[in-house]
A protein has these predicted regions:
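Extracytosolic ligand-binding ectodomains
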Residues: 1-114
Length: 114
């Protein structure tokens, strides 16, 4: 909805939520590490995506981290829990292009893949 407000009613593309979540996770990992390196991301990205206080934005996560807490980022595309191989099983939506717009055909929540 926020995207549509800022972009003359245009809806975001089918992967916008995933892209948004990736940026949020990386930013939270860097915030938690206090460093801006690939190693910092690698060492912190899992810990900001599970086991802490649920947050859905960088701003909320930054506050929790600043207070010494742990965060569990719950993304726009669903939960961001990594498996042992580093994959996130997110929610899936089957979409179709109709009359110049994306429409949802079927939605599968992340919990369906656990």
């Amino acid at each position: 909805a926020l995207h549509a407000e800022k972009h003359d009613g245009e809806e975001p593309g089918p992967f916008a939520a995933n892209s948004f979540d990736m940026v949020q996770l990386v930013a939270l990992a860097l915030e938690q590490a206090g460093a801006c390196t690939g190693v910092a991301i690698n060492e912190n990205i899992r810990s900001v995506s599970e086991g802490g206080e649920p947050v859905s934005s960088f701003a909320a996560g930054k506050e929790v981290i600043a207070a010494g807490g742990d965060v569990d980022y719950e993304g726009a595309a669903g939960p961001m829990t990594f498996d042992e191989s580093g994959t996130v099983a997110g929610s899936y939506s089957i979409k179709a292009a109709r009359d110049g717009a994306w429409v949802d055909e079927k939605f599968y929540p992340a919990s369906a893949f656990e």
